[in-house]
Amino acid sequence: MQEMKPVKEGKVREIYDNGDSLIMVATDRISCFDVILNNEVTKKGTVLTQMSKFWFDMTQDILPNHMISVDVKDMPEFFQQDKFDGNSMMCRKLDMIPVECIVRGYITGSGWASYQKNGTVCGITLPEGLKESDKLPEPIYTPSTKAEIGDHDENISFEQSVTHLEKYYPGHGQEYAEKIRDYTIALYKKCAEYALSKGIIIADTKFECGLDENGNIVIGDEMLTPDSSRFWPADGYEPGHGQPSFDKQFARDWLKANPDNDWTLPQEIVDKTIDKYLQAYEMLTGEKLK
């Protein structure tokens, strides 16, 4: 069996070059505040991969995606080890567009902080009188630039995203900025409506898009996972304050409350975190994680 080494390691994912495709492995690492924690969260990588597959399958009518297979039998022999089973995805190679596509359907997090200051989020003026966690009249698109590991992503306005993309794709900045905005809002709307029918509010989420060899826009990376999205239980939803969520919030809250944490979580917080991930997966897909 030929040993393979990742060509790129992100905070959570490892990417392997498989010639005309990539193998994307979601590890059990967890990152908060752009820092990789010392803990691993068992099964987290499998939740991320299988949930992305679920949404990719559901949304091909809106936008094609980069997924080829999540079956390790379709991958080189190196990936036919237990540690890769379930958390690995074979993908098409894309030229990734250097903008994170954030769609917000509810006002929370950094969006709420910005609104409190001046009534806007990423240059978009919102109605007066919104409360924390309120549903927005329409989902808004608030792009950000993609940071290297250790840096923070920077929120930008739509106009700034046009200028930013024009540098990479001369003559196509406006076109690509508009397309990724319109596609990702459409993806969010379809998936948020479905999720609500299963008892989950998708408050906001981050998509990443790329160009295939023919210059078509394709959805890449992960899609609508607890790592890239805020999932709230619809049961008990009440604007006016923060909401409980099916994601890393347990971990974030504990780290904030314990500033001397040296980036290590107690096991109880790790267990609560994976419970939330599994609960979201089961509610959305109607299946238990294999």
Where are the predicted features?
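Active-site loop/lid in soluble adenylation, ligation, and acyl-transfer enzymes
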Residues: 1-148, 261-290
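Coil-to-beta-strand transition motifs
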Residues: 21, 96-98, 198-202, 214-217
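Intrinsically disordered, low-complexity acidic/polar segments
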Residues: 33, 112-113, 214, 228-230
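Generic recognition of stable, solvent-exposed alpha-helical segments in well-folded globular domains
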Residues: 46, 50, 175, 179-182, ...
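Conserved metal-phosphate-binding beta-hairpin within the catalytic cores
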Residues: 103, 202-223
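Anionic ligand-binding catalytic core segments
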Residues: 117-118, 126-175, 223-284
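A long amphipathic alpha-helix within ATP-dependent nucleotide-binding catalytic cores
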Residues: 171-203
